[in-house]
């Protein structure tokens, strides 16, 4: 036989592909079986020589799949080799992954526990072994395609006929042990500790074969290969002796399992040897896992599902969404707790193949981008969570605060927002705008609750520092530069630090913080508050290099030469927009941004005379309020918009009015007047309208209606624009319309692949909470970018939430009767000073305010999609989701050799159900 013929013969012996076994398909050089066997031979030729590669192929042809042989038995089948050479050849073939060895006696034919070699099945078996070889799969990348295809082709069109328990095919989900109810009649095989104790002393670990495979194929989902695959029993010893893994202790294995749960990875055990043996425990990520694909792609949960199903308690659930984000099956989504006018929403259950014809039209080919990525049911969920750009678990932390769980509330907030104290002072409060309670009386004082929670942490002896939660267990050593130390840049650094990086923030100013310290007055947010939250970032390993302007002091190219592999540009909009009218160059005219910078730096402590502020947004309010504190004269704001059109947060506008700022609506500056080079007044004209019929900014003026306002100072706060200097010099990154940096809307990647952008220079002028959201997305993209083979989009949670229909709900009477919204007290000693005069809520106010929450949202589990992994239970801090043992038949484990004995009867019963269902439908 030729080599190709030998490979084809061996491939047919091992394969589970029905079309090959039935003779419909041949094993040709482009067939996956051929690719796998040939890569093993090529690896052997490199490590040993061509003769050894040829010889191990001949030896393999004398073996039968999954029939173990001792060295004596192999010698009888291969008399052409002397004993010493045969032993060397068996070591070589074992290292190649085609053959495995063990000492077990499960078949009763090895009472003395002699070493025996076995020709493995492809999956699970030799394909994974070839992948975890530290050299082989990278040397011969076609190995990855072999693994991927052999985990797919034998199952396509078959999985719908597989009974509960998996029929000895592939892998089987085993739940998080602490999630198994104590009162359930669980079996020992449903507990990971049972298997680890059974094999204690023979436990090892290897890199994940699936993660490595997807990396090589360029389809990684950000779950970078690390040591996640635990080998047990003789397989662990085999891996150690062939350099496929190394030994670990029982305790180390338990630590890996805990880290896997922290990451949201699913525990699975091998399911091809019956109830008395497994050889591996995998910790699987749905974006890359071939085993989970067997149930998720084909929509046939029997291939994976454990005996358990998750159930959510609607009374306890607060729609934090953490279970949804990590559900590998997409079984949990956020819905609503409030009834509609027609009654409670009845959430649908996914169709199953038990009584339905199942073809590709029933598959979910997009499962990697749906499971854990689609957050809400079509009817929506809590409006506060949906409206927040960072999608903080608002309903959740309000519940915790009301129960006095302040530290837990802070931890929950910090999963999505690194700056709760900052946001507690200056947030845009999108959540309060959306709050369902606002349709009854007033929205919850959500921001005040968050501020209180953050202050408890700031007062604590030991601040909460979020722990690293790396997808590889270890820190990453890739160097990442954050250009700009504002909220977007620091948020990116924060989430990268959690992922295991040590990013470096380059900030051109003397201290980090961006507009938080330079553009917002201290009576709105104390600089000590900003510093305290930045200090937490330092403790997380973020480095700040201040007084360094990238593009001037050092270039991106120079940083690349220093080893930086990715850049996050978040330089904001640093220059104020101009009026472009006569007199703008007079002394006394200043941009609001420059004015606030000088005030915050302590360089400007007094103004003389009356002040006119031009602008109608929040920044203009800040400027006007700051000016009031520096002058004995009057402060008047003039803006284009009518009062109801002003782009201000109502609270901010009201605070300005309370301070004494006079707001004059529908006026536009025409010219600034002066004498001797100094401002003496300003001429304004009537603004008739601000936007045209399409909503585009197109102000219309009546120049015949004018007023002249005497003043000594004109502060212009009409917006900001970008000033990039040379930060992007020498790169392909470019601006759109000369303003914002062009980027992908999902990944925030610029036209230069290693440059990502965020904050105002990406989105235009927005708020701190918006910047935080873009910082998180930047971190997600950068992590994927700097790790080879990871895509920027596969299994990316785009964090899209839909709010419930507030026009179709029935509000709970007992909640509506709760007290009125708590008012924010004012410290009279701080009024019109540079200190924040707002008094933080008391604990009593917190409890009262939390009681007003209507608890709109909840998680809803589809039991037909749930695979019973229990990961959801590890993410819930409210005791709201639990596993129940409702599918005991799913714990039936049988040897792979008996799979057709299980599939046949089940398939026959299923066919009867399909016929009955079809007949019933025809009668209708």
Which residues are covered by each model-predicted region?
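A conserved FAD-binding loop/helix module that cradles the flavin
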Residues: 623, 761-786
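Flanking helices and flexible, charged tails adjoining ferredoxin-like Fe-S electron-transfer domains
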Residues: 329-383, 398, 444-446, 450-479, ...
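Glycine-rich dinucleotide-binding loop and its adjacent helix/turn
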Residues: 453-474, 532-552, 576-630, 735-751
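Ferredoxin-like iron-sulfur electron-transfer modules
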Residues: 81, 117, 268-280, 297-326, ...
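A short, conserved structural fragment
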Residues: 94-108, 332-333, 881
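Beta1-alpha1 glycine-rich phosphate/pyrophosphate-binding loop at the start
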Residues: 392-402, 443-447, 482-550, 577-580, ...
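Short, amphipathic alpha-helical interaction segments positioned at domain boundaries
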Residues: 108-153
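FAD-site-proximal beta/loop scaffold in flavoenzymes
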Residues: 585-608, 672, 692-765
């Amino acid at each position: 036989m030729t080599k190709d013929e030998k490979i084809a013969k061996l491939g047919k012996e091992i394969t589970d592909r029905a079309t090959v076994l039935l003779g419909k398909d041949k094993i040709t050089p482009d067939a996956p079986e051929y690719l796998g066997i040939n890569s093993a031979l090529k690896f052997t030729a490199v490590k040993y020589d061509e003769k050894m590669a040829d010889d191990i192929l001949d030896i393999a042809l004398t073996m039968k799949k999954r029939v173990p042989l001792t060295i004596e038995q192999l010698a009888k089948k291969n008399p052409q080799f002397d004993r010493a050479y045969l032993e060397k050849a068996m070591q070589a073939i074992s290292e190649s992954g085609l053959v495995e060895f063990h000492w077990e006696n499960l078949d009763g034919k090895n009472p003395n526990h002699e070493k025996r070699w076995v020709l493995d099945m492809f999956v699970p078996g030799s394909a994974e072994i070839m992948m975890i070889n530290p050299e082989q799969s990278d040397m011969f990348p076609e190995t990855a395609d072999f693994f991927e295809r052999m985990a797919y082709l034998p199952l396509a069109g078959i999985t719908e006929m597989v009974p509960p328990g998996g029929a000895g095919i592939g892998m089987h989900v085993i739940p998080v042990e602490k999630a198994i109810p104590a009162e359930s009649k669980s079996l020992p095989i449903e507990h990971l500790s049972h298997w680890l104790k059974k094999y204690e002393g023979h436990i090892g670990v290897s890199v994940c074969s699936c993660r490595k495979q997807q990396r090589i194929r360029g389809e990684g989902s950000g779950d970078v290969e690390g040591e996640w695959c635990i080998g047990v029993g003789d397989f662990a010893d085999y891996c150690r002796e062939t350099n496929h893994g190394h030994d670990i202790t029982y305790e180390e294995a338990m630590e890996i399992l805990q880290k896997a749960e922290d990451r949201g990875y699913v525990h699975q055990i091998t399911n091809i040897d019956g109830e008395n043996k497994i050889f591996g425990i995998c910790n699987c990520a749905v974006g890359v896992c071939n085993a989970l694909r067997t149930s998720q792609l084909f929509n046939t949960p029997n291939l994976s599902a454990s005996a358990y199903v998750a159930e959510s308690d609607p009374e306890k659930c607060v729609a934090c969404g953490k279970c949804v984000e990590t559900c590998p099956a997409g079984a949990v989504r956020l819905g609503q707790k409030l009834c509609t006018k027609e009654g409670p929403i009845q959430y649908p259950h996914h169709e199953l193949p038990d009584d339905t014809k199942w073809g590709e039209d029933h598959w979910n080919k997009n499962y990697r981008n749906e499971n854990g990525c689609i957050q809400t049911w079509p009817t929506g969920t809590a409006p506060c969570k949906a409206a927040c750009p960072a999608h903080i678990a608002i309903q959740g932390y309000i519940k915790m605060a009301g129960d006095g769980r302040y530290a837990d509330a802070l931890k929950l907030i910090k999963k999505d927002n690194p700056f709760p104290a900052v946001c507690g002072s200056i947030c845009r409060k999108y959540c309060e705008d959306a709050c369902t309670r606002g349709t009854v009386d007033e929205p919850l004082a959500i921001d005040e609750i968050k501020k209180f929670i953050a202050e408890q942490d700031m007062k604590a002896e030991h601040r909460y520092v979020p722990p690293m939660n790396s997808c590889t267990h270890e820190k990453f050593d890739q160097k990442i530069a954050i250009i700009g130390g504002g909220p977007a840049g620091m948020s990116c650094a924060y989430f990268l630090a959690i992922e295991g990086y040590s990013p470096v923030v380059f900030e051109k100013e003397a201290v980090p913080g961006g507009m938080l310290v330079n553009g917002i007055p201290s009576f709105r947010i104390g600089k000590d508050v900003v510093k305290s939250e930045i200090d937490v970032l330092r403790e997380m390993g973020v480095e700040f290099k201040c007084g360094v302007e990238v593009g001037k002091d050092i270039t991106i190219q120079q940083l690349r030469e220093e080893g930086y592999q990715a850049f996050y540009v978040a330089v904001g909009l640093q220059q104020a927009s101009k009026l472009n009218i006569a007199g703008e160059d007079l002394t006394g005219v200043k941009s609001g941004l420059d004015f606030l910078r000088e005030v915050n730096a302590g360089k400007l402590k007094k103004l003389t005379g009356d002040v006119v502020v031009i602008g109608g947004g929040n920044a203009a309010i800040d400027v006007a309020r700051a000016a009031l504190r520096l002058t004995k004269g009057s402060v008047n704001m003039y803006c284009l918009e009518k009062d109801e059109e002003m782009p201000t947060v109502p609270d901010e506008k009201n605070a300005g009015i309370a301070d004494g700022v006079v707001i004059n609506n529908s006026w536009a500056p025409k010219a600034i007047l002066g004498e001797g080079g100094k401002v003496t007044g300003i001429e304004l004209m009537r603004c008739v309208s601000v936007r045209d019929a399409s909503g585009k900014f197109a102000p219309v003026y009546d120049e015949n209606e004018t007023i002249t306002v005497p003043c000594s100072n004109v502060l212009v706060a009409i917006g900001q624009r970008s000033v990039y200097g040379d930060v992007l010099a020498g790169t392909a990154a470019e601006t759109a319309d000369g303003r914002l940096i062009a980027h992908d809307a999902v990944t925030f990647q610029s036209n230069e692949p290693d440059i990502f952008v965020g904050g105002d220079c990406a989105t235009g002028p927005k708020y701190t909470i918006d910047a935080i959201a873009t910082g998180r997305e930047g971190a997600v993209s950068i992590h994927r970018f700097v790790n080879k083979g990871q895509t920027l989009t596969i299994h990316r949670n785009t964090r899209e939430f839909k709010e419930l229909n507030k026009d179709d709900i029935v509000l709970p009477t007992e909640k509506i009767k709760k007290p009125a919204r708590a008012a924010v007290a004012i410290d009279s000693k701080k009024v019109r000073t540079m200190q924040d005069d707002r008094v933080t809520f008391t604990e009593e106010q917190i409890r009262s305010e939390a009681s007003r929450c209507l608890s709109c949202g909840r998680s809803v589990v589809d039991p037909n999609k749930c695979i019973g992994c229990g990961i959801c239970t590890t993410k819930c801090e409210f005791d709201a989701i639990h596993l129940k043992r409702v599918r005991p038949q799913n714990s039936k484990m049988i040897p792979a050799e008996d799979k057709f004995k299980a599939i046949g009867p089940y398939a026959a019963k299923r066919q009867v159900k399909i016929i009955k269902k079809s007949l019933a439908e025809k009668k209708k």
